[in-house]
Amino acid sequence: MAEFIFKDLVRSRGLEDHFYIESAAVSTEEIGNSIYPPAKRCLNAHGIPFDKSKTARQITRADYDRFDLIICMDRMNLRWLKYIIPDDPQDKVHLMMSYAGIDRDVADPWYTGDFETTYNDINTACESLLHKLIS
């Protein structure tokens, strides 16, 4: 959801030529799967466009060099990421909610089924992140 929420925020400000935004998983369990149907419904409910052909891929060590930021939704993903990208000398790796000044993980709808709370967390953090990047 975060990829498409952030893309929508960037697009709404006419900044899409200045950003390349892509999501990737730290684990292999969802590789090749499309966006989870309840996440699609939540994005649709908020009018957020998404790529219907998007499938999950795993982050790679090369992604560290390709991207300016690598943002994890929660501390567990951050721990798993360290197996793939053990060092962060350029301070690129951050927790999503830290951009909103909140010291907690994004609410995980996998366990709660509450995609609306997750949407709100991600949207709040993405708004703050975009503000920081364009300031």
Model-predicted regions and their roles:
Residues 1-66, 131-135:
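Conserved active-site segments centered on acidic
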Residues 1-2, 49-51, 72-76, 86:
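A short linear-motif detector with a strong N-terminal bias
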Residues 63, 69, 75-135:
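Phosphate-binding/catalytic loops
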